[in-house]
Amino acid sequence: MARVSYSQYGMYSSCQQQYKLNYIDKLGISNTNIHLIFGSAMHETIQHFLDVMYNVSKKQALTINLDTLLFDKLVEQFNKEKEKTGDDDPCTQAELGEFYDDGKKILKYFTSKLDKLYTKSGFELIAIEQRLNAEIKPGVHFIGFIDVLLKDKVNGEYVIIDLKTSTRGWNKYQKNDKVKT
């Protein structure tokens, strides 16, 4: 059975030769960097907070030291990526420090806008990192993950949240790109 992820589909849509070299010929290069480490650490930090908020209480979630949790997740992700690359560090200590400082600011903003961004009233947390596996044609499956999945208790609609940690926002072309949205 063939499997296609969102990133594979995106690469194929933009450059079929790059897709062939990377996924068929297996000539791809590891892209481990601070952005991957930071994105994974920030996702895990926010997802843990939301899990506690929706499944225990908002009060309990607000007692979590998010800065410490983010630091621990950054170290964990750094070590995980370092194992993959051997002795080479996936990023510098300076990059880790800079991104950690940015992450603390993001988390401060996140908690200050919590009531506007995430309401507990009328919503339930269905899943974090919900795996998707849909057959898009016989023998080919699209695979992916939903970062956060909420359900509106009143109308039964689902809210899909895709956490983003890009250093740049999307321009109007990216927002209108049907591959991305």
Q: How does the language model describe each region?
A:
Residues 1-14, 140-151:
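An acidic intrinsically disordered interaction segment
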Residues 4, 34-37, 95, 140:
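Generic detector of ordered secondary-structure context
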Residues 25, 50-54, 115, 150, ...:
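Hydrophobic/aromatic-lined pockets within catalytic cores
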Residues 45-128, 135:
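A non-catalytic, helix-rich entry segment at domain boundaries
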Residues 1, 16-29, 81-90, 160, ...:
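Short amphipathic alpha-helical segments and their helix-coil junctions
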Residues 28-36, 93, 171-178:
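Short, charged/polar micro-motifs that form catalytic or ligand-binding hotspots
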